[in-house]
Amino acid sequence: MPLRLPDKLPAIELLKKDNIFVMNETRAHTQMVRPLRIVVLNLMPLKITTETDLVRLLSNTPLQIEINFMRLKSHTPRNTPVEHMQMFYKSFKELSLQKWDGMIVTGAPIELMPFEDVEYWQEIQTIFNWARTHVTSTLYICWAAQAGLYHFYGIPKHELPQKMFGVFRQYPLIPDLPIFRGFDDTFMMPHSRHTEVWRSDIEKVHELKIIAESPDSGVSMVMAREGREFFITGHLEYAPDTLDKEYKRDNGKRNDVVKPFNYYRDDDPSKGPFVSWRSYANLFFCNWINYYVYQETPYNIEEIE
């Protein structure tokens, strides 16, 4: 799939090494097609890494996709150069004037804070409400999934006694859904979080469907509004070495750090990770783009409501 990205975005050179077809804006303007328009609200600290992870997964269909990145007014990132944010990110005020075929809201390392104590909570609520009338389908990932479930449906999050950290086997509960097209009877998903949502809370809300879960990591996927909203509690988008970097960053600094479960070869960090989720991640994002964005969005994007 030709990915339409801003000129000079750092992810471009990395993706070209993976033989992913990347099209800059100059070339894209010469093609007489309407690209799917995806906006990404990237709340992760290492923004360039997350950009690359997501863009790589959006590269698996023959559709042209235009990707834009959104920044918050109420929060200034500390781990990303100001120049990068100014060059590649646009404000919600600017992007909110347009409509979008799809949206992705990432996680953020703030899950132990009450939602109302997050400095950008009010702005996030405004963006969530806006997405319901301006986006065909939205993916909420990890913290964003918990935040969206709380904001829209009053689902609380609960602190875990120990960090959910590793790669866990998931079970599709409605396997004939288009989002699971091509999936096996089980699939793997990385998790890295200190909080969770409970099945018992979600089951009280008839608008919500739990579509995948694990006996070890709990609810992993929730769908609402016939696929216009997906809440994903894990990280299918993670690169092979992400959990390894988290473990090495925290090991020795805190007493509660444990090795990521079911991740290293022979459970030995020196042998590197055993990647068991990559194919499912590609399938999931491909199915989302095809069945819940491309096939549902109007050709006239202004008709989204």
Task: Go through each PLM region and give its residues.
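Helical hinge/lid and interdomain linker segments adjacent to catalytic or ligand-binding clefts
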Residues: 85, 89-93, 108, 115
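Amide-donor transfer/coupling interface in amidating biosynthetic enzymes
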Residues: 1-74, 89, 93-95, 99, ...
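Short, glycine/acidic-enriched capping/hinge loops at junctions between secondary-structure elements
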Residues: 50-53, 79-82, 115-116
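N-terminal beta-loop-helix "entrance" segment that forms/cooperates
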Residues: 73-86
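Cysteine-nucleophile active-site neighborhood
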Residues: 100, 105-174
